[in-house]
Design a protein with these regions (language model features):
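A short glycine-rich, Lys/Arg-flanked "PGG" loop and its adjoining helix->strand segment in the class I
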Residues: 134-149
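Class I SAM-dependent methyltransferase SAM/SAH-binding core
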Residues: 51-55, 59-111
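Conserved Class I S-adenosyl-L-methionine
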Residues: 3-8, 32, 59-61, 182-275
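Conserved class I S-adenosyl-L-methionine
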Residues: 2-50, 61-65, 85-88, 96, 151-176, ...
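A short acidic, Gly/Pro-enriched loop at the edge of an enzyme's catalytic core
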Residues: 109-121
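A short SAM/SAH-binding and catalytic strip from SAM-dependent methyltransferases
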Residues: 119-134, 156
């Protein structure tokens, strides 16, 4: 598979997801990813014969569900920077005997499709990984036919308790970790898309949260977080401060413990709008 030119941050993102290629679809997390993909396709109301662009397609969950909807007369193009995830997607597509999906290794922030190329553009869960979301939304707007739809799956700024607590602790050390800030509320989502030129914006809010155990999550979640490029700024702290930050992180989580465990909010917004 051909390589693409990526900046350091995007190379690191691709490496993180390539390391997960064998596990991404598995277990509770894999089921959750699949549920989000199916719900997004449902909210967009993908139809027979449509041409669909799936941005950050990953292991092809959205692409495959959309392909079933568009049928043989439609076409899906899935784009991702992680070659390992695309390899998984290719195998899944072959196993499903679908011939209406084309996968491409490319950066979704610098695509050059012609204007008015797609009936639908979708991006599931990947917006926090992008470097210029407002510009990206304007670019994707140009790809849509008049009246075409964009569909986004994004998260509230209250979602994912480990990330929320990590952001809080990081701010004490002068570090701003941006996660779901741009899409953190329905009003923010609406403003973001309106500014990019979209209209008829509809937002469906759903909750995928659950209670989790502190014993099984604190140390592991800290270590896992530091392996993600978004959190690399924390690694620049002196070792003493980093250990202090970790202790504060665990203390903050401890304050959230109830008799049911810690509530891990997973408020999700399915945003659909037209060109």
């Amino acid at each position: 598979m051909n390589k693409i030119k990526l900046n350091k941050f995007k190379r690191e993102i691709a490496q993180v997801y390539d390391r997960r290629q064998d596990t991404y679809d598995r277990g509770k997390a894999g089921r959750w990813h699949y549920d989000l993909a199916c719900r997004l396709v449902e909210c967009v109301d993908v139809r027979s014969g449509q041409r669909v662009l799936d941005l950050a397609t990953g292991t092809g969950m959205v692409a495959i569900e959309a392909a079933k909807k568009v049928g043989d007369s439609g076409q899906i193009i899935g784009i991702d920077i992680a070659s390992g995830l695309l390899a998984v997607a290719r195998q899944k597509i072959a196993d499903a005997r679908l011939n209406n999906i084309t996968l491409k290794l490319a950066d979704i922030e610098v695509l050059n499709f012609a204007e008015n190329s797609f009936d639908c553009v979708m991006c599931c869960s990947a917006l926090p990984l992008l470097t210029d979301v407002p510009a990206d939304l304007r670019l994707w707007h140009s790809f849509l036919v008049p009246g075409g739809k964009i569909g986004l799956c994004v998260f509230a700024d209250t979602a994912f308790v480990h990330g929320v607590v990590l952001q809080k602790v990081a701010r004490r050390y002068g570090i701003n970790l941006t996660m779901s800030d741009l899409t953190g509320t329905p009003d923010k989502c609406r403003s973001l898309l309106t500014t990019a030129g979209y209209r008829n914006i509809e937002i469906t809010t759903e909750q995928y949260g659950s209670y989790i155990s502190l014993d099984s999550s604190a140390d592991k979640s800290w270590d896992t977080s530091l392996q993600h490029p978004h959190c690399y700024p924390l690694l620049n702290l002196p070792s003493q401060d980093l250990e202090k930050a970790k202790a504060e992180y665990i203390e903050e989580l401890q304050t959230l413990v109830t008799d049911k465990g810690i509530w891990n909010d997973m408020t999700t917004y399915f945003v659909v709008a037209r060109k």
